[in-house]
């Protein structure tokens, strides 16, 4: 007893709290000191003591112990404030949806993390003995993130696909979740309702496949004698921890020297002591043996495997290392399918490091070294390419900050920054463990209206005529509000753009008749000339004539040219020609002539080559019902069962009309009803109804057939397909394409019915109501043949077609709707399917670089006989005419001004032509008896309007003309309540309201003309008009849009606001919300300026969507979009989180070698590149062998790295060698590429690499093959044992094939023996199988080699001689390529 007491007196007494780490240290010291048995005894006593104390203190988790962090309230409030600002910015069009998502996720992630860091100090200060605090921070129970969910906030969750849900859960579990939050948290939580069962089965299946692939791999030899090796070096970005993990338990493949000293020899296994020496001496590089280097793929040797994981010694012979490997990869999957909390989806929150300002002061840097960009949150920033030195000058001291390259600078030069303000963000390199993946995000329109791009848009080359467009630069997409008018009464071609229509009358009168008797006083035409005798600036001729009369030409209304100048036209001039028109007096009275030629002359009168001059709607191609048009070059494809199903390849599409060279097209009728979303439908989707069935309360069906109901956001599309329904049997292979046309006379084989012949074409459409079941709808088709020449002389005057010298007119048929596009009919009207057009062309060679012509309507009166002409001028190049011609007609000012007189509206400006370098403008005056005012139109569409006080001179930047203006105050012109005649502009007191041609950007098609390489430009014009009721109207030949006043905003500004604001607003300009235009405050709504009046603007409201470069725009310019249509698709890179929810599918994806993400795609490309290069260097036989081997080595290493990355990010340690054994099986096959020796392998056969090598040597000729990655499922079905294949999957098929081929199973693996009940060749069963080959192992290596393969000696020498000679360069290129494309280390991580 005394001795014990004396010993105790010597011991040191520690008095401190012991937590997990201290406990670990204590135990390891006890083991070192006392050994295992005694330590366990001591620990038992500690445990008992702990239990006694815990019982006495009665520590338990009570709900009152969960104390919410006090700062949570304002933190959450702050985050909400930030996301509100973000939402506003998104609404104004400053950030797009992806940036908004990213930023909101980072805001909430930061809030959540901050709360988490607050937690511990908060507990420590307020309640240090709190049981929650004691338990979680001592490591006894619970960790920080779990407690954080109890007392902080749960934060962001990811959905089952691993995408973040950007609605954070703000409450914690102590406060309780709202219903929404509960449902969201079920997605993300560990024990999620949605989660566990599915994931567990996934992981189990993964394990099963893994074991299946590698079950036959057993340690059969001590040394296979391989010369291959893999280098590991601690340099390139490997952490020391990973370096140690990679090396420990491996076997060296080469001696390692430090200077002259050899510190380790070949075939020595590496322990921790040796590794420490490597690290201290920085030995470079270390060559090791791995399962990759082992010479056989069906077994493995002890030295290539290394130490056994169980008892740090070399692995025993007969150990089933394959099964161990498969299970050690699969098993963590079962544990890890459960989710981690916050790390889902998108955020790269932790990865960006910030540089903060050291003190207050002014920041300065060299602006030439940076250029502006957007951050990934859509904030403006500067990107620096090289190191940037930033100085911050405070009052007393100057701080220097060095910012590394590729960083973002978030402040401007000379800006005042406060201390600790973030001034730059450093992009982290590839050292982070994040997979990048490319994600598509679709943005849907939330309102209906017309699409508008604010930039030129590239057409992707393969979609030149389609509707997929790539954005070259950041810009806005605008959706201009306005809905299509679905009126059943008005035929579409009566109203032309700019017409004023009394909307109410449309629904009342059955016929729409315009009163032509009202003379049109308001239309004034200006004629410009540049008079050589006049001043340099060019005079303006005011031209006042009697009332113009309106000429009705077939269906369109145009103001006629005043007759005073008819004599000019009678003479034909060079480069100009006249088209006389058939002209009836009767037609003037009857506006709605049934069919007739309609001319299409744009209001600005400029026609380009190949533009349409006139068109004729042939009554034969009219349909009264909706339907789908199909046409293309018809190709007959023989599909399974050799039925001639015709499949339609997409034809090139022109927009808005589709020119066709086909001689026939098909129209598939269907009945379409577009109903409001609230309407109650009385039929079910996919049900079959008869004729005259009631669909909704007041609509009955006109045809019987299959009903398809499609719900969009605010409307329901209900289609009825006539025809019959056919349920295919097992044998009928119906093509999975969306629709096929079957020609008449084809016999449809069906087991149940007798043979059946179709008389007409039919359209077959496959409809899949559920995943398993599908049926086929067979619909009748109307076939239209297109006649080649429609009898022209009857349509167009004869002499016109004979003038060949200066113009060519071609007759072209256009199909109006696109291939496969639905044409929507409007009840009680007809749809025109084909339009015959007269296309204007002229000989490019004769006229030189003629780009465009000017066309106008002319009326010539001779002896009281009136005829109408279209006058067409050829304009040489837009600039060459300025001031040269001297006739009262000519294009006096440049064509950018008005060179023709066909504009209906007096105020108008043409689009900018790309060839103008100098913006010029024109001034036009209007003289009337009552008042006078001035408008300046310039090529940039800017204008200033208004009375100028005290006869001031008004100078404008764009115009060289100085004009003086006097305004007489007169009595206001009364506004009539009825509609004014066509083209009239409503007058108000003292100012003009004018509507104006709004020009859109020109879209450049990258199609060259045939004759010379002029870019072919097509201009898109839109016109809008306002009438007295505030309605705005825009029509196309095919659709009407009416705007209600609710879509517009009116502003009443000060009378003389032009003096107060320097900003001029141009017509057609887009204004974003919240922009300060005038001084009285920000602009309320975003939109496009339609009408500028003296003290008010009319703005058509529009919604901007921001799109960044590379985004894909769906839909055409000016197309009508409904709510819920796809607008843009963004492709953005997202960090794959290490979350195992994505991790497990990820591992599986790598093991099944599915090339889903971009990495494995370029892996395959690189593989091919390698094969070619190596073959070029080495000649064919060695090229294939070495090429395949290098390829395989490269892909092995990258696969191992990818799999390890997922597990390491979860903190799961799996030894590389397990993964390597599996990966070795994936890469052990090659594909025979061409039959060098037809009697050995057939091309396309999968054979083992070693077998290919050996056969090549034995035959003394090259077998051509290439490396291939085989997924684990495929590898399990491509083994040497058909019994193991059959027990895995597809039993009947595998056994039948094996029987037919007469395969022999040598029963080498475990599974075959288990199935047949033999002894398993591992462990003790291994010895008997092996002992007869013992003496073989004692033969010296050289003799054995020579006996086994005669050519082996020379072969080996040549091969490895080569390998050494360009081994160095291979390794170098390896390192480079693998680093570039994977962001992995070199060969190291393996």
From Swiss-Prot:
CC annotations in GO: chloroplast; DNA-directed RNA polymerase complex; mitochondrion
Enzymatic reactions: RNA(n) + a ribonucleoside 5'-triphosphate = RNA(n+1) + diphosphate
EC numbers on record: 2.7.7.6
The encoding gene: rpoC2
GO BP field: DNA-templated transcription
Residues engaged in binding Zn(2+): 224, 294, 301, 304
Cellular compartment(s): Plastid, Chloroplast
Pfam family of the protein (one): RNA_pol_Rpb1_5
Residues making up the signal peptide according to the UniProt record: none
Coiled-coil regions, chain positions: none
This protein's UniProt keywords: Chloroplast, DNA-directed RNA polymerase, Metal-binding, Nucleotidyltransferase, Plastid, Transcription, Transferase, Zinc
Subunit-level organization: In plastids the minimal PEP RNA polymerase catalytic core is composed of four subunits: alpha, beta, beta', and beta''. When a (nuclear-encoded) sigma factor is associated with the core the holoenzyme is formed, which can initiate transcription.
Chief location of this protein within or outside the cell: plastid
Domain of life: Eukaryota
Annotated cofactor note: Binds 1 Zn(2+) ion per subunit.
Transmembrane segments: none
Keyword Transit peptide set for record: no
Cofactor(s) the protein requires to work: Zn(2+)
GO MF terms held by the record: DNA binding; DNA-directed RNA polymerase activity; zinc ion binding
InterPro entries: DNA-dir_RpoC2_beta_pp (IPR012756), RNA_pol_beta''_euk (IPR050254), RNA_pol_Rpb1_3_sf (IPR042102), RNA_pol_Rpb1_4 (IPR007083), RNA_pol_Rpb1_5 (IPR007081), Rpb1_funnel_sf (IPR038120)
The keyword Plastid appears for this protein: yes
Species annotation: Ceratophyllum demersum (Rigid hornwort)
Function: DNA-dependent RNA polymerase catalyzes the transcription of DNA into RNA using the four ribonucleoside triphosphates as substrates.
Record's protein name: DNA-directed RNA polymerase subunit beta''
Family that this chain belongs to: Belongs to the RNA polymerase beta' chain family. RpoC2 subfamily.
């Amino acid at each position: 007893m005394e001795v014990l007491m004396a010993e105790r007196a010597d011991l040191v007494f520690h008095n401190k709290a012991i937590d997990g780490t201290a406990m670990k240290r204590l135990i390891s010291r006890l083991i070192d000191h006392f050994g295992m048995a005694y330590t366990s005894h001591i620990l038992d006593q500690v445990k008992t003591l702990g239990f006694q104390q815990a019982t006495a203190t009665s520590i338990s988790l009570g709900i009152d112990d969960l104390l919410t962090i006090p700062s949570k309230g304002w933190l959450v409030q702050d985050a909400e404030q930030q996301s509100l600002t973000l939402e506003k910015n998104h609404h104004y069009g400053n950030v797009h949806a992806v940036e908004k998502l990213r930023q909101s996720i980072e805001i909430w992630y930061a809030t959540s993390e901050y709360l988490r860091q607050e937690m511990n100090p908060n507990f420590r200060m307020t309640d240090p003995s709190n049981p929650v605090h004691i338990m979680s921070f001592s490591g006894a129970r619970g960790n920080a993130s779990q407690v954080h969910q109890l007392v902080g906030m749960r934060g962001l969750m990811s959905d089952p696909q691993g995408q973040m849900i950007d609605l954070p859960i703000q409450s914690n579990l102590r406060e309780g979740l709202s219903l929404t939050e509960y449902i969201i948290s079920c997605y993300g939580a560990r024990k999620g309702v949605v989660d566990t069962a599915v994931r567990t089965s996934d992981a189990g299946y993964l394990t099963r496949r893994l074991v299946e692939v590698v079950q036959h791999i057993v340690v059969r030899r001590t040394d296979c004698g391989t010369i291959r090796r893999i280098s590991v070096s601690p340099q390139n970005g490997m952490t020391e921890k990973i370096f140690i993990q990679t090396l420990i338990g491996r076997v060296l493949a080469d001696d390692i020297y430090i200077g002259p000293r050899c510190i380790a020899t070949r075939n020595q296994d590496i322990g921790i002591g040796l590794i420490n020496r490597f690290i201290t001496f920085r030995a470079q590089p270390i060559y090791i043996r791995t399962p990759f280097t082992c010479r056989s793929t069906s077994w493995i040797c002890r030295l290539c495997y290394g130490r056994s994981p169980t008892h740090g010694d070399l692995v025993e012979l007969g150990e089933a290392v394959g099964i161990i490997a498969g299970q050690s990869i699969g098993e963590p999957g079962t544990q890890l399918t459960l989710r981690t909390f916050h790390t889902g989806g998108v955020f790269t929150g932790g990865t960006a490091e910030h540089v903060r300002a050291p003190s207050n002061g002014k920041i300065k840097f060299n602006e030439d070294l940076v250029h502006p960009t957007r951050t990934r949150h859509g904030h403006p920033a500067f990107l620096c390419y090289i190191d940037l030195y930033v100085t911050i000058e405070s009052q007393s001291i100057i701080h220097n900050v060095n910012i590394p390259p590729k960083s973002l600078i978030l402040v401007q030069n000379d800006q005042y920054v406060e201390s600790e303000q973030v001034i730059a963000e450093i992009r982290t390199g590839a050292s982070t463990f994040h997979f990048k993946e490319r994600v598509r995000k679709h943005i849907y329109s939330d309102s209906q209206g017309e699409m508008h791009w604010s930039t030129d848009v590239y057409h992707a080359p393969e979609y030149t005529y389609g509707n997929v467009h790539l954005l070259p630069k950041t810009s806005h997409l605008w959706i201009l509000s306005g809905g299509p008018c679905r009126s059943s009464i008005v035929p579409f071609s009566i109203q032309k753009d700019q017409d004023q229509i009394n909307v109410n009358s449309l629904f009342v009168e059955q016929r729409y008749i315009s009163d032509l008797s009202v003379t049109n006083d308001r239309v004034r035409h200006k004629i410009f000339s540049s008079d050589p005798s006049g001043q340099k600036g060019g005079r303006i001729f005011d031209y006042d004539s009697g009332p113009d009369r309106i000429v009705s030409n077939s269906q369109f209304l145009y103001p006629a040219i005043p007759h005073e100048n008819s004599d000019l036209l009678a003479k034909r001039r060079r480069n100009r020609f006249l088209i006389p028109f058939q002209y009836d007096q009767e037609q003037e009275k009857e506006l709605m002539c049934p069919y007739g030629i309609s001319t299409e002359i744009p209001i600005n009168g400029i026609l380009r080559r190949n533009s349409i001059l006139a068109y004729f709607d042939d009554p034969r191609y009219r349909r009264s019902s909706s339907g789908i048009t199909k046409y293309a070059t018809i190709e007959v494809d023989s599909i399974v069962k050799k039925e001639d199903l015709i499949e339609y390849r997409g034809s090139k599409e022109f927009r808005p009309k589709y020119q066709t060279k086909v001689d026939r097209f098909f129209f598939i009728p269907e009945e379409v009803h577009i109903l409001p979303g609230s309407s109650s439908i009385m039929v079910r989707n996919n049900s079959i109804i008869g004729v005259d069935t009631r669909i909704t309360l007041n609509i009955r069906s006109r045809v019987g057939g299959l009903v398809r109901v499609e719900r969009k956001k605010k409307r329901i599309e209900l289609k009825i397909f006539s025809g019959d329904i056919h349920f295919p049997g097992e044998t009928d292979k119906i093509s999975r394409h969306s629709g096929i046309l079957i020609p008449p006379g084809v016999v449809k084989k069906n087991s149940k019915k007798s043979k059946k012949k179709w008389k007409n074409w039919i359209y077959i459409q496959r409809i899949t109501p559920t995943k398993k079941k599908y049926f086929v709808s067979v619909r009748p088709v109307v076939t239209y043949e297109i006649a080649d020449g429609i009898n022209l002389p009857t349509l167009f005057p004869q002499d016109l077609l004979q003038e060949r010298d200066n113009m060519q007119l071609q007759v072209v048929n256009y199909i109006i709707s696109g291939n496969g596009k639905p044409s929507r009919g409007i009840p009680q009207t007809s749809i025109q399917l084909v339009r015959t057009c007269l296309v204007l062309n002229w000989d490019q060679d004769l006229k030189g670089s003629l780009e465009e012509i000017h066309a106008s309507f002319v009326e010539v009166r001779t002896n009281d006989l009136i005829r109408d002409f279209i006058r067409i001028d050829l304009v040489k190049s837009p600039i060459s005419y300025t001031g040269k011609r001297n006739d009262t007609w000519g294009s006096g000012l440049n064509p950018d001004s008005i060179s023709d007189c066909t504009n209906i509206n007096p105020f108008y400006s043409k689009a900018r032509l790309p060839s103008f370098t100098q913006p010029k403008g024109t001034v036009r005056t209007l003289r009337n008896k009552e008042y006078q005012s001035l408008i300046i139109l310039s090529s940039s569409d800017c204008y200033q309007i208004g009375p100028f006080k005290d006869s001031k001179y008004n100078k404008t930047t764009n115009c060289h003309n100085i004009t003086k203006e006097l305004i007489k105050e007169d009595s206001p012109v009364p506004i009539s309540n009825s509609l004014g005649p066509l083209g009239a502009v409503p007058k108000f007191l003292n100012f003009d309201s004018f509507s104006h041609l709004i020009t859109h950007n020109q879209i450049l098609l990258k199609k060259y003309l045939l004759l010379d390489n002029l870019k072919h430009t097509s201009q898109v014009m839109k016109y809008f008009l306002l009438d007295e009721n505030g309605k705005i109207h825009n029509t196309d030949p095919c659709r009407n849009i009416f705007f209600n006043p609710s879509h517009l905003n009116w502003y009443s500004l000060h009378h003389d606001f032009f003096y107060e604001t320097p900003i001029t607003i141009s017509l057609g300009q887009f204004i974003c919300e919240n922009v300060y235009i005038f001084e009285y405050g920000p602009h309320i709504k975003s939109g496009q300026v339609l009408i500028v009046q003296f003290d008010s603007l009319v703005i058509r409201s529009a919604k901007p969507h921001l799109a960044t470069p590379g985004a894909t725009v769906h839909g055409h310019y000016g197309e009508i979009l409904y709510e819920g249509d796809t607008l843009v698709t963004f492709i953005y890179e997202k960090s794959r989180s290490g979350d195992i929810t994505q991790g497990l599918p990820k591992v599986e994806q790598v093991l099944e070698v599915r090339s889903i993400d971009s990495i494995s795609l370029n892996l395959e490309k690189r593989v091919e590149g390698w094969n070619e290069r190596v073959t070029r260097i080495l000649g064919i036989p060695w090229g294939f062998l070495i090429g395949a081997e290098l390829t395989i080595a490269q892909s092995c290493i990258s696969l191992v790295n990818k799999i390890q990355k997922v597990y390491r990010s979860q903190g799961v340690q799996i030894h590389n060698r397990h993964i390597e054994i599996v990966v070795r099986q994936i890469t052990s096959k090659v594909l025979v590429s061409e039959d060098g020796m037809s009697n050995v392998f057939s091309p396309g056969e999968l054979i083992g690499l070693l077998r290919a090598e050996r056969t090549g040597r034995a035959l003394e000729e090259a077998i051509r093959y290439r490396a291939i990655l085989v997924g684990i499922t495929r590898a399990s079905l491509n083994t040497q044992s058909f019994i193991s294949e059959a027990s895995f999957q597809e039993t009947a098929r595998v056994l039948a094939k094996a029987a037919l081929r007469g395969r022999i199973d040598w029963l080498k693996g475990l599974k075959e023996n288990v199935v047949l009940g033999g002894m398993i060749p591992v462990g003790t069963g291994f010895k008997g199988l092996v002992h007869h080959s013992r003496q073989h192992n004692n033969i010296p290596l050289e003799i054995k080699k020579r006996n086994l393969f005669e050519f082996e000696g020379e072969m080996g020498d040549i091969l490895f001689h080569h390998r050494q000679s360009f081994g160095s360069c291979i390794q170098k290129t390896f390192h480079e390529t693998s680093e570039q494309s994977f962001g992995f280390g070199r060969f190291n991580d393996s």
